[in-house]
Amino acid sequence: TEKLDYLQDLGIDILWLSPVYKSPFIDQGYDISDYYAIDPLFGTMEDMEELIAEGKKRGISIIMDLVVNHCSSHHEWFQKALADPDGPYADYFYFIESDKEPNNWESYFGGSVWEPVPGTNKYYLHSFHKDQPDLNWQNPVLREEIYKMINWWLDKGIAGFRIDAIINIKKDLEWCSLPSDRDNGLVPVPESLVNAQPIEPFLQELKERTFAKYNAFTVGEVLNETDEELHFFIGKDGVFSSIFDFKQTMLGQEGKGWFDHSLPTADELKESIFQAHERADSIGVQSTIIENHDEPRGVSHYIAEGQVNDTSKKALGTIQILRKGIPFIYQGQEIGMENQVFESVEDFDDIATINGYHVAKEAGLSEEEALAAIAKYSRDNARTPMQWSAEPGLGFSDGSAWLISPKPDVAINVEDQEKDPDSILNYYRQLTALYRHPLYGNTIRFGDMIPAYRERENIIAFERRGDKRLLVISNFQNRQATLELPASIKTVILNNVAGLFQEGDQVLELAPYQTVVLELVE
């Protein structure tokens, strides 16, 4: 709550909280043991109510993470199911009688999705960790419990939810094994979703029983959606207000593990942005990210190695914030936090990262190579404490943090950037201020986005057209570029370097990673 003024100064309208519910924290709180309680690690319910109230005073709405594909194995529902395998709570989950694992599906965190129930001939399903049993959405009693919980939070005053892993609630109830090309014979669980029953009835009912009653804002975590599903998710009568555009985060992920991934190029980033926009623009609103709690730091991922600096960080931020959509800024993004330095696998906390390390080792990589591979992509890169200052504890806490890099770059912190008018933080404030600008706000919030210089290598540029004609150009490379403008410049709205070199009215010479926001003469 004490940081709400900071968020207000940053131009934030909505604050999304990762899970703060009671949890044993096997998976950073995405294993919820009580949906109605705040974990003592974060405070009390009174603290939560104060945050909601103080946020409203500042025009900041609070949304929570809604994790209803699974709960924690510590949740009373699952404990009651284990205590009475034939009782009503067993039907809250997926228990299968079998003398072996029912199929060859592989969980998101590695290994089989099936865990044996000790002392029985049954297995239960977990698409994620074994301590995150999947909830059985086929059961109307379970669905009623979920709707009751959601409405309880909406009654408390939150504005909506970010909806976690929701595509996974649909299942192939035939539990069919699938062809595998892997040495372990397993198939990643997302591939099973192709044969799953329709998800539409579940989500339509979810919306009608909860979100629609409160005009709640919802943003779905949905990957690999089809064009038809896009209409269902965010069309005129879509079940969600928005979904995240993950197309750019999935670039280079065609391999069999993190060790086999490749970092995206500037042109791949550009095309993913434009293709996602062209696919969704006539349908609904996407939410944009360059990083989140499930991704490495964006500046370390999208900017070429050796070229990460304040100028290139501002360039990347400009592209994300000013492209069409709802921009989400992840904590620390606004000060340019980078991937952390991890010296051994023991430094990591994230279960997906540790699994990625073992997958790399099994593929024949050395310890050093496996560590280098997971360090690039680890979710822990974005899960270290927010760097408020350079002092011990980074201004986050006087105590021991749950996760901290052995060598944090303490030079990147809020306190120092507050004092520097040219800092990344103050540049982000200028970016978000454009959404409220009396001349340009409507164009940026609601205007069309039209790709520009699409064929030019390493140039990421687009027009925003509405009340005004704006042009965003980023020379996303480590060398100069010359561009001929489509019209004369009326106003230089924003520039991430000092000065703008022009030859005549319509020719620009851009420095490496120089990024400008221009109003053009119409």
Describe these PLM feature segments.
Residues 182-183, 191, 201-203, 207-210, ...:
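Loop/helix patches that line or flank the sugar-binding groove of alpha-linked glycan CAZymes
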Residues 15-17, 62-64, 161, 218-220, ...:
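Hydrophobic faces of well-ordered beta-strands that scaffold small-molecule active sites
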